Amino acid sequence: MTTETRSLYSQLPAIDRLLRDSSFLSLRDTYGHTRVVELLRQMLDEAREVIRDSQTLPAWCENWAQEVDARLTKEAQSALRPVINLTGTVLHTNLGRALQAEAAVEAVTKAMRSPVTLEYDLDDAGRGHRDRALAQLLCRITGAEDACIVNNNAAAVLLMLAATASGKEVVVSRGELVEIGGAFRIPDVMRQAGCTLHEVGTTNRTHANDYRQAVNENTALLMKVHTSNYSIQGFTKAIDEAELVALGKELDVPVVTDLGSGSLVDLSQYGLPKEPMPQELIAAGVSLVSFSGDKLLGGPQAGIIVGKKEMIARLQSHPLKRALRADKMTLAALEATLRLYLHPEALSEKLPTLRLLTRSAEVIQIQAQRLQAPLAAHYGAEFAVQVMPCLSQIGSGSLPVDRLPSAALTFTPHDGRGSHLESLAARWRELPVPVIGRIYDGRLWLDLRCLEDEQRFLEMLLK
């Protein structure tokens, strides 16, 4: 060991001496004595390794307390961090899908802080059913006879099939054998539920007679699956639920539908593309309809099944129902969200998902122009900051081919180097409230459709 190396080792402080420093008192109060000591030992090992490998001290050795504070602050951050979603995808699966209405947030907070009547009947002090209050709301909104709630729509489809068709055949059009994110495939779900898939028709064309010829003594269900995350166009043919229900009645086979996104309002009244609604399918006579709570409905993650009372009863009594049931926070948020639908005139204001989807391109354009000047002043030395038209998407497999006119702030490096865009995007992801955009066509795009808190946005980007 050289004299220089010995000198560097001698400059490493003892842990006891560091802990006596006043700057470590608050760190010990905040993070605990044990964790601070563990980290200091780790940092001393790191420093010795740096000395051994490069004959120098780490830069942070000049201020141990500052480095400990920085590391422990980062360590204490929640894995679920709030972000500013400027990707242009409103219902972004990786960012948690639907934002919750204030009424839902308040309802969840109350449910978390107090015992609630989850399965308790106040009228007779007996055991109640956790789905009852929501079932009444859903029946009022959709016209169904009864309803069942589980933890997501994949679970809803699994329960629907397992409870009504296990050991039997389910007839589905070949063009509706969907796969959604996470490799959720209808054929796989059927196998898991104990059903036999009987696919009919071709990828692009399925006729009523295809279903008719497939039905036999072992057929349990005729199933429709809404292709919410892709579209087959051109020379196509599919029969709708009403026609399939008529065929099912003739053959004495019930019809069920996996609707996927499941909007409870006609989106076309807001200038958005129309999506099938559960109440339309119930009116057509479909026995069971499943859909998501956290997509177009704008609530928490949940799987909702509405339909005929005797069919719902089979779901409620199936052993899988307990394994898949929703917890009290989910039910509280979903109930509060559904109550907003009882006042449709205020829905676009109080439901964040609908509010963001219905923002006009003109309003977003004005917002972008308002924000351009301060951002150009801050980033102008390295990037050209411009306002550009763009197209948002709904996301989460909802209306996959439809786009919403929007406006974006774009950042283009003066030197044209893509690495500068990657570096800028990485810097923004490290902010206290990360700002998430997307890199496309030599620019970093910030689609402002989902930006409602301009002040927080500027505070982050002008740091």
UniProtKB/Swiss-Prot annotation:
Its cofactor is pyridoxal 5'-phosphate. GO terms for biological process: conversion of seryl-tRNAsec to selenocys-tRNAsec; selenocysteine incorporation. GO terms for molecular function: L-seryl-tRNA(Sec) selenium transferase activity. Its EC number is 2.9.1.1. It catalyses: L-seryl-tRNA(Sec) + selenophosphate + H(+) = L-selenocysteinyl-tRNA(Sec) + phosphate. Coiled coil: none annotated. One of its GO terms (cellular component) is cytoplasm. It comes from the Bacteria. InterPro entries: PyrdxlP-dep_Trfase (IPR015424), PyrdxlP-dep_Trfase_major (IPR015421), SelA-like (IPR018319), SelA_trans (IPR004534), SelA_trans_N_dom (IPR025862). The modification N6-(pyridoxal phosphate)lysine is found at residue 295. Keywords: Cytoplasm, Protein biosynthesis, Pyridoxal phosphate, Selenium, Transferase. Gene3D superfamilies: 3.90.1150.180, Type I PLP-dependent aspartate aminotransferase-like (Major domain). Homodecamer; pentamer of dimers. Binds only one seryl-tRNA(Sec) per dimer. Converts seryl-tRNA(Sec) to selenocysteinyl-tRNA(Sec) required for selenoprotein biosynthesis. This is L-seryl-tRNA(Sec) selenium transferase.
